[in-house]
Amino acid sequence: MTITRKSHPLMKMINHAFIDLPAPSNISSWWNFGSLLGLCLMIQIASGLFLAMHYTSDTLTAFSSVAHICRDVNYGWLIRYIHANGASLFFVCLYLHIGRGIYYGSYMYKETWNIGIILLFLTMATAFMGYVLPWGQMSFWGATVITNLLSAIPYVGTNLVEWIWGGFSVDKATLTRFFAFHFILPFIIAAMAMVHLLFLHETGSNNPLGIPSNSDKIPFHPYYTTKDLLGIFILLAFFLTFVLFFPDLLGDPDNYSPANPLNTPPHIKPEWYFLFAYAILRSIPNKLGGVIALVLSILILALFPLLHTANQRSMMFRPISQILFWTLVSDLMILTWIGGQPVEPPFIVIGQVASILYFSIILILMPVAGLIENKLIKW
């Protein structure tokens, strides 16, 4: 008689995905971030659901409903801060996951990689709309500035912006629809994550060496279930410490003032996880050019499989590519810093140089480094 987990239609799927899945024996802790992202998504959906029970998506009551959650709802302050900082945790894991993919050449699984890029766009859209919901000053002005970027699209731009707003400015209609989309998108993200896994399990995981590991596989359970659990506990310990001791560290003080269309904050900026893209947007004086650069800064990830010139998949034994990779990481940190600074010298020039370097490393230097390393191997 077959074991239930191998014969039952539903259990069989779970078994193939999480129990009897053949996994490479040498994948490091960098491969933990997939499961950690799943955990982040579950935390966000659960905390968001409880927040939605008390939140009202009306311009007159949105701000006070958030205050009500923090003051009057049992542990409402905790749920609110878990949700707000959970978004930051989500993006930390997301960026580390993407960085791992770039370093070890995981982008060569094109379908998995492209679904991942779609997931990134969906997550960014969800986070942006969620930031608008508390209806504070930065919520309102962030929504106004970012949606206004679409007006740079020739011919249809203005109509498109007014269509998204549901009027001639960011108002009640905008807030209501943003709440509706913010609620539904995480479930779409969850569905896309399943597709992401489906494509991954077609090929199997990559590994640090970037070579086929079919000759040396181990079952996912108990080895990697235990390893994932360790990662989950470490992450939760760090996360809860952060939420309970520094809940407002990453937030903007302006968002504790109710939205006022008549008073513009001195520095309008998004949350920290969008600052690198915001810096690239601001580094181009032309509005349409800036918007194109902003979209390309993320969409450029789709070019990685096409720009891979090296004979080796992973960067583990490619020193020149390693230097370029860590330069890219440093460059992104500089862009993140610049995105939070006012538009004045010397920040303007630093932002422009960092933006040029960002695109140069990915489009020119990395492919050239791959070709040089191919030659070095033959010497």
Curated annotation (Swiss-Prot):
A ubiquinone binds at H201. It comes from the Eukaryota. Gene3D superfamilies: Cytochrome Bc1 Complex, Chain C (1.20.810.10). The keyword Transmembrane helix applies. Heme b b562 binds at H83, H182. Its main location: mitochondrion. Heme b b566 binds at H97, H196. One of its GO terms (cellular component) is mitochondrial inner membrane. Binds 2 heme b groups non-covalently. InterPro entries: Cyt_b/b6_C, Cyt_b/b6_C_sf, Cyt_b/b6_N, Cytb/b6-like_sf, Cytochrome_b, Cytochrome_b_C_euk/bac, Cytochrome_b_N_euk/bac, Di-haem_cyt_TM. It is a multi-pass membrane protein. One of its GO terms (molecular function) is metal ion binding. Its cofactor is heme b. Coiled coil: none annotated. PANTHER family: CYTOCHROME B (PTHR19271:SF16). Heme 1 (or BL or b562) is low-potential and absorbs at about 562 nm, and heme 2 (or BH or b566) is high-potential and absorbs at about 566 nm. Belongs to the cytochrome b family. The cytochrome bc1 complex contains 11 subunits: 3 respiratory subunits (MT-CYB, CYC1 and UQCRFS1), 2 core proteins (UQCRC1 and UQCRC2) and 6 low-molecular weight proteins (UQCRH/QCR6, UQCRB/QCR7, UQCRQ/QCR8, UQCR10/QCR9, UQCR11/QCR10 and a cleavage product of UQCRFS1). This cytochrome bc1 complex then forms a dimer. This is Cytochrome b. It comes from Chaetodipus baileyi.
